[in-house]
Regions:
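Extracytosolic ligand-binding ectodomains
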Residues: 1-101
Length: 101
C-alpha cells in the first residue's frame, strides 16, 4: 500500500486517491511492468503473451494476505482467490479465510 500512497500523493488529487478505479489501474500497470520485465529484450507479441501466461505468485499492493496472481497457458484468469467481506456501514470487514479454487 505504501507504493500506492506514494504514487497517489505525487500524481493524483485527493478525490482520485479514493477512487477504486484509480487503484485498479495502478495495480494493472504494475502487472504490465512485471510482464515486460519478464520479457527482457524480446518484446515480440508472442513473448509478451508467453510471459503474461507465466505469472507466478505476483502480489499487488492492497491485496489480502496470501492472495497472489498466477497464470498459465491453460488458465488466463489471473485472480483465482477471493475474500468475502461485509460492509459494516463505513468499511468492508473481511469474513473468514481467503478462498481459492
Amino acid at each position: 500500500m505504501k507504493q500506492w500512497e506514494t504514487f497517489a500523493a505525487k500524481y493524483l488529487s485527493a478525490t482520485d486517491f479514493k477512487d477504486s478505479s484509480a487503484f485498479y489501474g495502478f495495480n494493472t500497470a504494475l502487472l504490465m511492468i512485471r510482464v515486460l520485465k519478464q520479457c527482457g529484450d524480446d518484446l515480440s507479441r508472442d513473448n509478451i503473451m508467453r510471459q503474461a501466461l507465466n505469472l507466478k505468485d505476483f502480489v499487488v499492493p492492497g491485496s489480502f494476505p496470501g492472495a497472489s496472481i498466477n497464470t498459465s497457458p491453460t488458465n488466463y484468469f489471473p485472480h483465482r482467490q477471493l475474500h468475502l467481506a461485509r460492509l459494516d456501514g463505513e468499511h468492508w470487514e473481511p469474513l473468514g479465510e481467503l478462498l481459492s479454487d
